[in-house]
Amino acid sequence: MHITKVLPVFFQFCTTMMNRIFILLFTLFSFTTAAWTQNLPEPEPPAKDTSSLLHVFRSGTFHGHARFFSMATDNASGLRDYAATAIGGGLRYKTGSFHGFSVGLGGYFIYDLASSDLSKPDPVSNAVNRYEIGLFDIQDVSNKNDINRLEELYLQYQHKSFKATIGKQLPDMPFINQQDGRMRATGIDGLQIHWKPGNSTTLQAGYLWQISPRSTVRWFSIGESIGIYPSGIGPDGKPSNYKNALNSKGVLIASIRQQIHPSLSIQVWNQLVENIFNTAMVQAEFRTPLNKQTTLTGGLQLIRQDAINQGGNADPAKTYFTKGGKSVVYGGSIGLLHRPWDISLNYTRITKDGRYLMPREWGKDPFYTFLQRERNDGYGDVSAIALKASYKLDKLHSKLFLGYGQYYLPDVQNTAFNKYATPSYQQLNLSWKYDFQAFLKGMDIQFLYVHKSVLGNESYAPKYLANKVNMSNYNLIVNYIF
C-alpha cells in the first residue's frame, strides 16, 4: 500500500485511541505532578542522545494552556442576539532528543459554561449563529461537555538548521494557519520540512493529507475539510453545493524566504491543492531606521490563484473553484515604528478577474487589511483600506490596539463576486491586553470590541445584516500558559 495511504490510517488510529484517554491523563497529571516531583530522586544531569529510553522521556517538556472565553454579539435592532462562555484546557508533551528524533503529543478539551441557544436561527432573517458557535463544536451544537481533540501527535527529526515533522501539528503558513480567535486552533496532519541553509535563506515545504478546522473535533481529508463552515452562494446565485463533493489527494506547499538586505526581505509561497486550485504569493517587506527611535516599515503583496482541472468536481454545481477561473490580489502597507507606537496604513485590492477563494476552515486572510472577526474570502472586485495602531505600556504590562477599515464590496446581489452577500462595510476593532506578573506570571487577560456597520445610506433586508454588519461583538479572554 502507498505510504500516503498508510500514514493517514495510522495517525487516525492513534487519534481515536488518544482522544479516549487524554482527559484522564490530563486529570491524573494535574493531581500527581507535585507528589511525583517530591518522591522521585534527583535526576542525573541530562546528557544528549543517551542510550537510556528513560532519560529521553524524563528530559521531555510539558506545557499547559487553560483558557476562559466569553463572547456576545449584539445584532441590529429586531434581530436575535447571542452570548456564550467557554472554558478549556490542554497539555502538550515533547520527549527529549534521541539522535535528533523526538515525539510530541498534545490535546485539548472544552466545556460550555453558559450559552444562548445557538441552534436557533434568527426568526426574521433565518440567519444562523456565526461567532459564538465557534467556541464549541460547529458540527454538533448540542455537544456541550464532550468537546475534545487530539491536536498533536508527531515524530520530529532535527539536525542543526534542518527540521522535519510528520503527523498532527499546528500550522504557521499564510493561507493555512492556526486562526486562534476562538478556544482552539486549526490543526494539520502531514509532513513539514524547515531548513535554513544559510543565514539569509529559509526554505519550507510540506504535504498535508488531513486538516482539523478550528471549532471542530474531527480530522478531515482535504476535500472533506472544505465546506464545513457555511459556504455561501455560487457564482450562479444558487447555494454552494460543494460540501462532501470535492476530491483532492492533498496540499503541496513550498516557500523560500530571503533576506536580500538587512532592511529588505522577500518571501515566495506556492500552495497547490491537488485537483482544486493553486495559489502563489510574493511578498516583500522592509524596515528602514530613520533615527534611533523611529523605523519606517512597509510591504508589498501579490497573490495569484488558478483553478486546477474542474476545480474539485466535474459537476459545475458542486465544484469549489470554477473551471478556468482565476483571481488576482495585490496590496501594500506603509508604517512607522516609534516606541511605544506601531502605526500602519494598509491597502488591499481584489481585482475583477474573479473571486478570491480560500477555505475559511483553513485559516485567516494574509492581507495587510485583515481585522479580526471578518474575512474577504469569497469576494472579487474589492477595495479595502485599513489603519492599524498599537501602543505598548511596558510599565503597566499592557498593550492597546486600534484598527479601522473600510471595505468596498460588490453589490449584495452580484453573486459572481459576492459569495456571502455582504454589503460594503466599515469596521472598528479596539483591544486591550494585560500580562500578569509575579505570582500570576503566565496569565493574561484580553478584551476585544468589534463594530461593523454599512458604508453609505442604503437600506438592506435583514438577511444581509444579521451577523454581518450593523452589529457589535464583545470578547473577554483569559489565558494561563504554563
Functional labels for PLM-detected ranges:
Residues 62, 99-103, 161-165, 200-203, ...:
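Repeated loop/turn-to-beta-strand initiation elements of outer-membrane beta-barrel proteins
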Residues 94-125, 140-221, 258-263, 345-351:
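Outer membrane beta-barrel
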Residues 113-117, 204-254, 294-367, 451-469:
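Outer-membrane beta-barrel translocator/channel fold
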Residues 178-185, 211-214, 246-248, 270-281, ...:
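Solvent-exposed loop/turn segments connecting transmembrane beta-strands
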Residues 64, 89-95, 153-157, 191-195, ...:
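Residues on the lipid-exposed face of transmembrane beta-strands in outer-membrane beta-barrel proteins
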Residues 52-73, 101-105:
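Transmembrane beta-strand segments of Gram-negative outer membrane beta-barrel proteins
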Residues 68-72, 107-113, 159-161, 168-173, ...:
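Transmembrane beta-strands of outer-membrane beta-barrel pores
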